[in-house]
């Protein structure tokens, strides 16, 4: 077996540049404050943009304007994306209305619901970063650890107000998130201008190097796999007995990101390893994250995710190390069953009699019209909202006596169609991609409406228009919209060209396979047409498209389209 300490035993200078940056950053302070105060440039210079990710902020520029600004000898049109930390996606209406106001003041590209059930504010200029983050404070919100080499925002599946089990699931997700947040004083120092001394013991869990890469934690309650639990570094699958949440099946090692030009880079499904009691979940997460902190690869950043640590050292080694730290082995996993990984749109009633409405939001984009509509509704009804990991929005806590009036009000505001959208649209995700994401190689969100229209037209030719198929579109292979768990996925390779993946599960528990590389829209539709035709005529009752492709062995013969770069 390889040395279980391949990196932390090495001198710092032998680790990758990001590790060295963290070590000299004074627990994520760097020179961010000085960069914010320099108004001669719209950017934060040097290494600080990497550190700002730990603060929930990405430095970007408008790629549509690069050539023009270069020709005019101007610096890029710098702007920032600010991501909030909202464990489980739960907000009250005052927080939402406050965010609406802040986004109108500071976010030129508006609000977007992410595939981890939080919000991003796009198009924030550098002088507006501090006022924005200071404006979040009285709302009880922040952005710390929404990005960076730490535990990203903890996701939690399903509406927490449907039952006591759902509510407890949300509370445990919140406790876990709070436990895994970095403790550095850098956030208050930089953003609230509250000077804090740098201490050696500032990060008792993370240490000065934090994690090798991001670490994603998710909670889910079957039969709905709405967070795609098998794509998480650490996943908790709720086990409910007579309405009580008694514990979790634990799964480890999931992850979506990959590089197309490296064979040792790949998506991976998380593996179920056993069962724990419900109350242990927060402490257990710290244990697992600690193993990744100590043994993750800190030399090759592209191999630093937890999935690669497990594959490098082996699952038996991990279970042995986990047992040593925990003091006892895991119990056997309990039986669970998933039915789908989408949201249940429309109306649902909780055990307490209250009603909740889930609204479809295209690619999670909360445009000006939707913000105005939601503002009008929340000023009259509702107390809380919830953001889903499928980029939708739930209006919760509607009393029975209000229900009819609320239905009328949603219709008056033009929101009622979002309760019953097109079935295919409701099962489709995309990432932001161009023009702001620096990693995007092709369009995604802006292209999705056109692609979806043509795909629906093709399905309609075979009588499948109302049959949902999970479809995901991303601008690069990094997997932000969890493409490798979809029945059909396109990941960007170059402008207008994508890799086509097929055969994932409708339940989110099987990886899709690379079927064709560098396909354009016409080739994509041409490849799918005969498969959809056979699916229409030969599928079994209730059989999903991905399952059909595997049963009929339609993915065994790859087309001639190049799979190489």
Model-derived features with residue positions:
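Peripheral terminal and linker regions in Fe-S/redox and tRNA-modifying enzymes
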Residues: 1-565
């Amino acid at each position: 077996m390889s040395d279980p300490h391949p990196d932390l035993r090495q001198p710092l200078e032998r680790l990758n540049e990001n590790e060295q940056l963290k070590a000299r950053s004074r627990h994520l302070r760097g020179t961010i404050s000085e960069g914010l105060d320099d108004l001669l440039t719209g950017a934060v210079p040097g290494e600080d943009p990497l550190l700002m990710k730990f603060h929930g902020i990405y430095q970007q520029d408008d790629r549509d304007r690069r050539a023009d600004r270069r020709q005019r000898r101007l610096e890029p049109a710098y702007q920032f994306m600010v991501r909030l930390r909202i464990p489980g996606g739960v907000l009250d209406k005052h927080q939402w209305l406050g965010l609406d106001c802040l986004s109108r003041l500071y976010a030129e590209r508006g609000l977007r619901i992410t595939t981890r059930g939080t919000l991003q504010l796009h198009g924030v200029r550098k002088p507006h970063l501090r006022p924005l983050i200071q404006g979040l404070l009285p709302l009880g919100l922040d952005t710390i650890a929404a990005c960076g080499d730490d535990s990203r925002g903890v996701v939690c599946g399903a509406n927490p107000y449907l039952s006591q089990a759902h509510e407890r699931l949300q509370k445990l997700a919140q406790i876990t998130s709070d436990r895994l947040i970095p403790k550095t004083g850098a956030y208050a120092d930089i953003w609230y201008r509250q000077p804090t001394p740098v201490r050696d013991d500032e990060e008792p869990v993370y240490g000065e190097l934090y994690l090798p890469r991001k670490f994603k934690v998710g909670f889910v309650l079957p039969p709905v796999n709405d967070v795609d639990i098998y794509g998480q570094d650490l996943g908790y699958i709720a086990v409910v007995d007579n309405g009580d949440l008694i514990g979790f099946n634990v799964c480890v090692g999931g992850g979506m990101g990959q590089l197309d030009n490296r064979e040792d880079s790949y998506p991976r499904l998380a593996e179920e390893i056993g069962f724990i009691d419900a109350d242990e979940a927060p402490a257990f997460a710290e244990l697992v994250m600690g193993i990744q902190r100590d043994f993750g690869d800190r030399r090759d950043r592209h191999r630093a995710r937890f999935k690669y640590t497990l594959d490098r050292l082996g699952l038996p080694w991990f279970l042995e190390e986990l047992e040593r730290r925990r003091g006892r082995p895991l119990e056997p996993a309990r039986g669970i069953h998933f039915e789908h990984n989408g949201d249940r749109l429309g109306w649902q009633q909780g055990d307490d009699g209250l009603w909740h409405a889930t609204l479809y939001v295209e690619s999670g984009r909360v445009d000006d019209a939707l913000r105005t509509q939601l503002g009008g509704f929340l000023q009259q009804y509702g107390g809380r909202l919830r953001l889903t990991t499928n980029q939708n929005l739930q209006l919760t806590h509607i009393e029975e006596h209000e229900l009819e009036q609320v239905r009328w009000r949603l219709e008056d505001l033009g929101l009622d169609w979002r309760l019953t959208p097109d079935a295919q649209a409701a099962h489709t995700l995309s990432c932001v991609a161009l023009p702001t994401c620096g990693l995007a190689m092709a369009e995604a969100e802006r292209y999705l409406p056109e692609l979806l229209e043509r795909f629906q037209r093709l399905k309609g030719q075979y009588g499948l228009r109302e049959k949902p198929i999970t479809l995901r579109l991303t601008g690069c292979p990094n997997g932000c919209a969890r493409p490798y768990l979809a029945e059909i996925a396109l990941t960007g390779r170059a402008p207008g060209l994508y890799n086509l993946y097929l055969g994932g599960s409708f339940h989110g528990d099987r990886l899709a396979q690379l079927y064709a590389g560098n396909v354009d829209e016409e080739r994509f539709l041409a490849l799918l047409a005969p498969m959809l035709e056979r699916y229409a005529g030969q599928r079994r009752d209730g059989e999903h498209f991905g399952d059909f492709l595997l049963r009929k062995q339609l993915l065994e013969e790859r087309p001639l389209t190049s799979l190489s770069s």
